[in-house]
């Protein structure tokens, strides 16, 4: 017999509403068609997506940025301009690989700072920063610049299960993250 632990418990009201962030402009085609959706293919749905009432639309990340240039012969900065011009009521969000930015190697601190400045200046409102190795030092410069630009910062960890990825290790990371 299972026990219902919430039976009789008072309803908890926080006054906060759930906010929904949609990743179709980044992750859907990254997962389904190797990040090959062109900006032209996105345009017909942008205004409808804006009207849904999402809190944010995630439209940029490492693979989308790279694929724009390498496979689609598009300028990812122009993609940002086009999307921002059609998304007027919804925040735009991106996923940033910390010190790797949207690339496949570490970049100098000044490059990280300039990239964040330009992304926010171009219309990105929210930047989710992560490091694939969960090395908080690789998130510090980007996180600092996101805050300086006045954008919304989200720090993320890459979750996995292994002998070194324990609850205690993640708890220590959380303590360190508070200082980033």
Which residues are covered by each model-predicted region?
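Short catalytic helix/loop segments, enriched in acidic residues and glycine
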Residues: 39-48
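A short N-terminal beta->alpha junction/helix N-cap motif
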Residues: 29-40, 71
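Surface-exposed loop/turn and secondary-structure junction residues enriched for glycine/proline
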Residues: 23-24, 35-36, 40, 107, ...
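Conserved small/polar residues in nucleotide/adenosyl-binding loops
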Residues: 178-180
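Hydrophobic beta-strand segments of well-ordered beta-sheets in folded domains
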Residues: 28, 55-57, 92
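Active-site beta->alpha loop and helix N-cap motifs at the rims of alpha/beta catalytic domains
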Residues: 61-174
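Terminal or standalone catalytic/regulatory effector modules within metabolic enzymes
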Residues: 48-68
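N-terminal amphipathic alpha-helix/helix-capping segment at the start of soluble metabolic enzymes
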Residues: 2-33, 85
């Amino acid at each position: 017999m299972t026990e219902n632990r919430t039976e009789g418990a008072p309803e908890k009201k926080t006054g906060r509403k759930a906010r929904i962030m949609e990743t179709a402009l980044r992750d859907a085609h990254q997962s389904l068609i190797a990040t090959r959706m062109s900006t032209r293919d996105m345009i017909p749905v942008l205004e409808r997506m804006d009207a849904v009432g999402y809190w944010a639309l995630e439209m940029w990340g490492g693979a989308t940025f790279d694929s724009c240039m390498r496979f689609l012969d598009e300028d990812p900065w122009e993609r940002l301009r086009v999307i921002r011009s059609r998304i007027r009521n919804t925040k735009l969000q991106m996923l940033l690989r910390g010190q790797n930015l949207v690339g496949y190697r570490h970049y100098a601190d000044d490059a990280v700072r300039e990239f964040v400045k330009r992304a926010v200046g171009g219309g990105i409102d929210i930047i989710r920063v992560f490091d694939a190795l969960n090395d908080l030092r690789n998130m510090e410069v980007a996180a600092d610049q996101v805050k300086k630009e006045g954008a919304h910062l989200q720090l993320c960890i890459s979750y996995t299960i292994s002998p070194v990825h324990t609850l205690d290790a993640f708890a220590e990371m959380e303590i360190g993250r508070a200082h980033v």
